[in-house]
Curated annotation (Swiss-Prot):
Keyword Disulfide bond among record annotations: yes
Species the sequence originates in: Ovis aries
Main location: secreted
Keyword Signal: yes
Similarity remark: Belongs to the IL-6 superfamily.
Gene Ontology terms, MF aspect: cytokine activity; growth factor activity; interleukin-6 receptor binding
Protein name: Interleukin-6
Signal peptide region: 1-29
Gene3D superfamilies given in the database record: 1.20.1250.10
Key words of the record: Acute phase, Cytokine, Disulfide bond, Glycoprotein, Growth factor, Phosphoprotein, Secreted, Signal
């Protein structure tokens, strides 16, 4: 009798076991909780809202501030006016009136396109930052990862209206310098310009 009972129900037991395994592997999506709103890790922000995108930008700005602070703690002339000497050699993406990101003449679509294109152009400068920064590399890598995530989010918003710019590896060579002060000045300028660039983009990000 026991043998018959086992024979009859073993297929059902196997099926239930498989169902439990599949349920564990692929959990049913639930509503997003409050913890998600404060989670600025790139993998979570791909499913995003304007609020979460804004949180990601603020997360990036915090990382920029942390790197600048670390550099300034080691360099007494960290952010003085002499930086303009190094700035003349850098062609950093900047917001202009025609880009639609300023309060006057604001245009969300144009601003989003400019923001995405500009962040793509910043990639080569971030590579320079990673090569030259002698501090916490983990912070720099997290900054780059967060910016790549932001680019992906923005690309979805503008539906492929821009193409990835060509990589100019020779630019990295031109930015190199044996002078420690010039090197640090360039890093600071890149970080400060990137922060300003992101701040101007927030108006377009906040709109539904």
């Amino acid at each position: 009798m026991n043998s018959l009972f086992t024979s009859a129900f073993s297929p059902l037991a196997v099926s239930l076991g498989l169902l439990l395994v599949m349920t564990s592997a692929f959990p049913t999506p639930g509503p997003l909780g409050e913890d998600f709103k404060n989670d600025t890790t790139p993998s979570r922000l791909l499913l995003t809202t304007p609020e979460k995108t804004e949180a990601l930008i603020k997360h990036i700005v915090d990382k920029i501030s942390a790197i600048r602070k670390e550099i300034c703690e080691k360099n007494d002339e960290c952010e003085n006016s002499k930086e303009t000497l190094a700035e003349n050699k850098l062609k950093l993406p900047k917001m202009e009136e025609k880009d639609g990101c300023f309060q006057s003449g604001f245009n969300q679509a144009i601003c989003l396109i400019k923001t995405t294109a500009g962040l793509l152009e910043y990639q080569i400068y971030l590579d320079f930052l990673q090569n030259e920064f002698e501090g916490n590399q983990e912070t720099v890598m997290e900054l780059q990862s967060s910016i790549r995530t932001l680019i992906q989010i923005l690309k979805e918003k503008i539906a492929g209206l821009i193409t990835t710019p060509a990589t100019h590896t020779d630019m990295l060579e031109k930015m190199q310098s044996s002078n420690e002060w010039v090197k640090n000045a360039k890093v600071i300028i890149i970080l400060r310009s990137l922060e300003n660039f992101l701040q101007f983009s927030l108006r377009a990000i906040r709109m539904k």
